[in-house]
């Protein structure tokens, strides 16, 4: 089962990716992890990636596609894989298709921007332990304090409203066009496309995914 997850940051993809991986026994492939692993391994592709990144440039689509092909040929991908954060653009999706990387399901997590802002901006973290709270959805027992240690909770820089809104604008400009692209691919019978209502509680979203994926 080969799956692509689409959706803005904060749409709940990470939570559900974990569930899909466990239930269907497929690994999640993140291009960031893949690049780091390739660089560390010192492979030919890894060396190319390192040179580009050391020069402060963006890794080309061709190189990322080559890494994806190499990664999905590994033993743990024999039953499929889950791609999150790639492809991000239509040229990347085209390049994947040309490279013969076919996908069974494209799942779009649909959540309105304002709810995403609400979800992310309300997060509070206890940095030493990694415990995460939410002022509205999962508040600590004492406002602003960690339940276990009583230490101050903080807001991550990435969770500040201005940053979140900037990331949403980027998502709508770059990645949202993929929704139209994969809808057409599904009409042509090349993949299955499903829109998932990401505003529902986690357990309901999970049940919806089980219905879609079988």
Swiss-Prot record:
One of its GO terms (cellular component) is cytoplasm. One of its GO terms (molecular function) is magnesium ion binding. Transmembrane segments: none annotated. Residues 30-59 are annotated as: NMP. Its EC number is 2.7.4.3. GO terms for biological process: adenine metabolic process; ADP biosynthetic process; AMP salvage; nucleoside diphosphate metabolic process; nucleoside monophosphate metabolic process; purine ribonucleotide interconversion. The keyword Kinase applies. The modification N6-acetyllysine is found at residue 192. It comes from the Bacteria. Catalyzes the reversible transfer of the terminal phosphate group between ATP and AMP. Plays an important role in cellular energy homeostasis and in adenine nucleotide metabolism. Belongs to the adenylate kinase family. Consists of three domains, a large central CORE domain and two small peripheral domains, NMPbind and LID, which undergo movements during catalysis. The LID domain closes over the site of phosphoryl transfer upon ATP binding. Assembling and dissambling the active center during each catalytic cycle provides an effective means to prevent ATP hydrolysis. HAMAP family: Adenylate_kinase_Adk. This is Adenylate kinase. It comes from Escherichia coli (strain K12). The gene is adk.
